[in-house]
Amino acid sequence: MDNYDHLKLENQLCFPLYAASREIIKKYRPFLDEIELTYTQYVAMMVLWERERCSVKELGETLYLDSGTLSPLLKSLEAKGFITRSRSEEDERTVMVEPTLYGGEALREKASPIPQAVGSCFDLSAEEAETLYRLLYKLLGKC
């Protein structure tokens, strides 16, 4: 055993998480292409479908995205007609985001079958999926 075993890729927790994330997102791609969304745009829309309206800051915090990623993402969603951005009436410094009529229920309806379709691609029991879900959120809570 050498002094650098801790630097082997196979000994890193981060690598299988990274690789699995990339592979899972690949499974989403064909479904998301049909509704003209990238994966990051899709998760942003999921937040907006839940909350109906939120600030850019809240959206970024929820999705762990910085403004350098979020700004072009929102610009693209706005150009597609899925969202609108406006200044908060309470605080002009705050930019609010909300789905348009098309980006709201219409797009949500088209996206509705995606989680089940993607989930069926993986050979995980309901118990395994629940355990993985809990462990991943436990890790996120420690970051």
What is each PLM-predicted segment?
Residues 21, 107, 140-143:
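A structural signal for well-ordered alpha-helices, especially hydrophobic packing surfaces
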Residues 12-14, 54, 88:
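Functionally engaged cysteine thiol sites
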Residues 72:
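DNA-binding alpha-helical recognition surfaces that contact promoter or target DNA
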Residues 22, 26-69:
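N-terminal helix-turn-helix DNA-binding core of bacterial DNA-binding proteins
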Residues 17, 21, 52, 63, ...:
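Flexible interhelical turns and helix-capping residues at alpha-helix boundaries
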